[in-house]
Amino acid sequence: MSVAEKVKEIIVDQLGVDAAEVNPDAKFVDDLGADSLDLTELIMAMEEEFGVEISDEDAQQIQKVQDAISFIEKKKGE
């Protein structure tokens, strides 16, 4: 499973949204209805799943689904 597919799966599980709504340009708050607690739980789930650390500063930059995918791919490539 690719990083993108796994990120999408985590988002569907954490936010309870339909997989069809989770596209690369979807914004977590505006499009997927996430609140600050949801965002924290998403970041924690991604850290656990991918074995990466996402700082608070980095987490604030992750606004869209593609932001999360790109960040994790970059971290895993280091």
From Swiss-Prot:
Using the UniProt record, give the first listed, main subcellular location: cytoplasm
In alphabetical order, the GO MF annotations are:
acyl binding; acyl carrier activity; phosphopantetheine binding
UniProt's post-translational modification comment states: 4'-phosphopantetheine is transferred from CoA to a specific serine of apo-ACP by AcpS. This modification is essential for activity because fatty acids are bound in thioester linkage to the sulfhydryl of the prosthetic group.
GO annotation (BP), single: lipid A biosynthetic process
The GO cellular component terms are: cytosol; membrane
- Family matches, as SUPFAM superfamilies: ACP-like (SSF47336)
Q: Would you say which domain of life the source belongs to?
A: Bacteria
The entry's localization annotation reads:
Cytoplasm
List of residues that carry O-(pantetheine 4'-phosphoryl)serine: S36
Q: Which InterPro entries match?
A: ACP, ACP-like_sf, PKS_PP-bd, PP-bd_ACP, Ppantetheine_attach_site
Q: Please list the residue ranges annotated as the Carrier domain.
A: 1-76
Q: In which pathway does it act?
A: Lipid metabolism; fatty acid biosynthesis
Q: Which UniProt keywords apply?
A: Cytoplasm, Fatty acid biosynthesis, Fatty acid metabolism, Lipid biosynthesis, Lipid metabolism, Phosphopantetheine, Phosphoprotein
Q: What does this protein do?
A: Carrier of the growing fatty acid chain in fatty acid biosynthesis.
State the similarity comment: Belongs to the acyl carrier protein (ACP) family.
Extract the NCBIfam families matched here: acyl_carrier, PRK00982.1-2, PRK00982.1-4, PRK00982.1-5
Q: What is this protein called?
A: Acyl carrier protein
Q: Which organism is it from?
A: Solidesulfovibrio magneticus (strain ATCC 700980 / DSM 13731 / RS-1) (Desulfovibrio magneticus)
What is the gene called?
Answer: acpP
